[in-house]
A protein has these predicted regions:
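Short, structured patches in soluble enzyme cores that scaffold and shape functional sites
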Residues: 36, 49, 69, 88-90, ...
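Residues in well-ordered beta-strands of folded domains
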Residues: 6, 66, 87-89, 121, ...
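Extracellular/periplasmic metallocenter environments
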Residues: 1-73, 175-196
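Short helix/loop capping segments that flank catalytic or ligand/cofactor-binding pockets
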Residues: 15-16, 55-56, 75-76, 94-97, ...
Length: 196
């Protein structure tokens, strides 16, 4: 299956952006140059191959791409095991447990551009669980869904402190009870789990 590497939100030259026709096939390679010469940000990479991007991403060709800079490091944000990239997506899981992507019965329009699943995955897992310590965590939130948007809130009724969005840190932290993410959108937030 052919693929194209694209880092969503990266500032790169046109030859390295992973345009849809710049595909390579299994057994071959292509060298991209990512200078990472931009502010700290939560980006994500995904396939971008013409006509099959939706299928390759549906199959799991995506991931977090985190940029850092001195300004961000000076903020002493939670890091290491206390920094969690969380990539959300929905998938349609058939009765036999296999992934299913809807197909069009219209030969003039073979693509199904918007597909909604019956299950939400986080980092490729159904119903993931992580035990947290009573401290602050940094959540790098990414919506890798085809069409679904998410409205996230915490059952503990604690706020998110949003510190970043698609292209990096916000001018000032923003306390929010809910974070909304539309397809390909990112948010960077800190949550304090102390006292739970």
């Amino acid at each position: 299956m052919r693929t194209v590497a694209h880092v969503h939100g990266a500032r790169v030259g046109p030859n390295d952006d992973g345009w849809p026709e710049d595909a390579f096939a299994p057994g071959h390679s292509l060298l991209y140059h990512y200078p990472n010469a931009q502010d700290a940000a939560t980006l994500w990479y995904h396939d971008h191959a013409m006509g099959i991007t939706r299928l390759n991403i549906y199959a799991g060709l995506y991931g977090a791409y985190l940029l850092r800079d001195p300004e961000e490091q000076a903020l002493a944000l939670p890091d290491g095991e206390h920094e969690l990239p969380l990539i959300l997506c929905d998938r349609l899981i058939a009765r036999d447990g296999q992934l299913y992507y809807p197909v069009s019965d219209d030969p003039a329009a073979p693509w199904v551009s918007e597909a909604y699943g019956n299950a939400t995955l986080c980092n490729g897992k159904l119903y993931p669980f992580i035990e947290v310590e009573p401290r602050r965590y940094r959540l790098r939130l990414i919506n890798a869904a085809n069409a679904r948007h998410y409205e996230l809130s915490l059952s503990s009724r604690r706020p998110f402190v949003q510190i970043g969005s698609d292209q990096g840190l916000l001018p000032a932290p923003l306390e929010r009870m809910r974070v909304e993410l539309y397809p390909a959108e990112r948010a960077d937030a800190v949550v304090d789990f102390s006292g739970l």
